[in-house]
Amino acid sequence: MMSAAQTLASRLKALQCHFTWDLDLRRSLLLRCRDNLLDISTDNGNRWLGHIYNLRGFIQYKLGSNEDAQRFFNKATDAFNKMRNADEGPWLVVNYGNLAWLHHHLGDQAESEAYLSKVDALNEKYPSPSQEELHPEIYAEKAYTLMTFNGDMNLVADYFQRAIEMQPDMVWNSWHVLALTYASKYSSTGLDDDIFQKMRIVQEQDPENLNLAAHYLCQRAQKGESIEDEARELATKVLGSPVGSYSGLKPLLWVYRKYISDDEAIDLAEEALKNHPDERYLKRRAALCYQKRVLRRNSPSTKSMLDRAVSLHQEVILLYPDSSLKKKLHLAWIYAQSHDGQAKAEQIYQELFKSYLEPEDKQMLYNYYAQYLYFQKQDHKMSLQYHMEAAKIQHQSFFRKNSIKVLEKIRDKGRHRMCGEIRTFLANLPEP
């Protein structure tokens, strides 16, 4: 017979909540997710507000702040109830599960038991429409959580699909389509026709969703449609909406950079900043626009543009102190564009090499430094060495793929003096 403690432990493990889901809990990712969640507008019309607070509570717990965790879990409860205009419902199952786990870790087993009982009562009163499936509210929250953690987008889309099949919901429909879009992110021709048509239908059903509208514009542009006028019309709407990462500004700026011009993208980002000069999210978006413009080789940057790019990156690094590695790498690359900035670029790289980085972040650093050595220092041998260091790290990412691609190109040409070493290296390189 199991003891009371064993029974409690088994009941906790059986819960559907953030504490039991298989999430990537690297500290650097937790910090990035926390900052990304802070950049989402928390106005009362945000249907994800309860989910956002739930996730922020879990992240704060994993980062060591139990008090903040409880505060956010309680805010999630309130947000769910206000949004649904009800004191209880299946949307609270994950939230109560989180609170059961938190009180268990705090040593308050009676309170943990109380929340377990609440979960049991909700599951009994609001069973899933399908005995073989989780409740659609749970699938939707699980999908949203994985999406925030940059998880498997195909799995995210599957969870949303399961939720929608049991409980049609316009917001879930929109996010299902976005998940399908993210899953096809690296396709040069855009979405498959069936997903594209689904996106068109959902966008017509959810016309106020500017984030979805901007992504739809991206896909239409990739299909060869002329979208300049619509992009400018959408920009007016985005500028008038609450500031946040769901406003549609990020994908819209991508459309501007790709299909209109880098300079107009900068103008749009600067206009947004003029309206809200203290918003760190807008500074982050503007910094990226300047970085892309500075790196455009066919049109040299003016000193004033370089100065603005540097100052924005410096601000963003200060505003995101725990999740600014990529911005530091971008700043180093911007410095490297001018002769006077070479020493500053090298200083940033060397400081990063001395800092503690998780393997995945170290991989990104090696890849960036390899490109810096090749393009700015013309040190091709050392550049290849750093590409090999990036490829060695057993983490599948864009940066690993890029480094391997560079090495394969050298191997296939067969003319570089390191060709034999690279051929042996690639032949013995294990897959993650």
Regions found by a protein language model. Give the residues of each.
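N-terminal alpha-helical interaction modules that lie
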Residues: M1-M83, N98-E113, S117-K118, N123, ...
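Eukaryotic alpha-helical solenoid repeat scaffolds
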Residues: M2-K13, L30-C33, D192-F196, Q203-E204, ...
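"A position-specific structural signal for the A-helix of alpha-solenoid helical repeats
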Residues: K13, W48-L55, K62, W91, ...
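Helix-turn-helix repeat elements of alpha-solenoid scaffolds
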Residues: T20-L37, K62-N81, G107-E124, F149-A157, ...
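Flexible helix-coil transition and linker loops at the boundaries of alpha-helical arrays
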Residues: L37-G45, A79-P90, L122-H135, D169, ...
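Start-of-helix signal in alpha-solenoid helical-repeat scaffolds, especially tetratricopeptide repeats
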Residues: D43, W48-H51, P90-V94, P136, ...
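Short amphipathic alpha-helices and their capping/turn residues within compact interaction modules
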Residues: G64, N81-N85, H105-D108, S117, ...
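Solenoidal tandem-repeat scaffolds enriched in leucines and small polar residues
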Residues: L122, Y126-S245
